[in-house]
Amino acid sequence: MIIYINDKPCNAKVGDLLLNTAKLNKAHIGYICGGNGICQSCFVYVLEGAECLSEPGEDEKAFISDKLFAEGGRLACRTTIVKEGTIRVLTRAEKFRRIVLGLNVPGFITYAQTIGYNVTNKLPSGVSSIVSRVQSGRLNPVDTIGKIASGLSPASQLVYNNFIEAFPFMQAPVNMVSGVAKSAIDNASGALCTISGGRLHLPGSTCTAHDKPAEAIERITISAK
């Protein structure tokens, strides 16, 4: 069967963990703690196919708030494919990337509020869950440290690859970068123009709505005697 991680088609089968599917298909899902369910770097949003996945367990409930569950939030290292169907997931990093590149200010505010709510309300239960698992023998600290160490190298490479994919102009010649940077400034100014009702623009930008370079807030004349 084919599932989609950040819109990338990935081969999978019933019984697979979402995290393992991502690894095998070189899709972007973080895995710093090696699948021990403590770092939350494998957090994903299930956009479609929640009924094809296992029910959230206690480890997930300890870290994920009701708000994030309502948005389809899951930990990929704790989520198993239980039946065939259409499954689409979006990683937290990819969702944030799309919000930033799309200059979605309201979306960013909502995103930040939800994440802040989750940290504030679930941090105590998350820590309690880790302590409980260590005490019961379900979590081996030595093994966990080893998994973190082995996962840092591929994880850092994955971050680099996805950064270059998200911002390809970083590999371009300087003259090309300047053009891309100007375009980014114009886009940001356009968003500011829309939000402010046309009253504000970024200095040096070109607003498509007004079709003229934005003026600096204040002009300063410097003369030498």
Swiss-Prot record:
GO terms for biological process: photosynthesis. It holds the Pfam family Fer2. Its cofactor is [2Fe-2S] cluster. Residues 1-95 form the 2Fe-2S ferredoxin-type domain. It comes from the Bacteria. [2Fe-2S] cluster binds at C33, C39, C42, C77. Keywords: 2Fe-2S, Chlorosome, Electron transport, Iron, Iron-sulfur, Metal-binding, Photosynthesis, Transport. One of its GO terms (cellular component) is chlorosome. GO terms for molecular function: 2 iron, 2 sulfur cluster binding; metal ion binding. Its main location: other. Binds 1 [2Fe-2S] cluster per subunit. It is found in: Chlorosome. Could play a direct role in the oxidation or reduction of the quenching species formed in the chlorosome. This is Chlorosome protein J. It comes from Chlorobaculum tepidum (strain ATCC 49652 / DSM 12025 / NBRC 103806 / TLS) (Chlorobium tepidum). The lineage of its organism: Bacteria, Pseudomonadati, Chlorobiota, Chlorobiia, Chlorobiales.
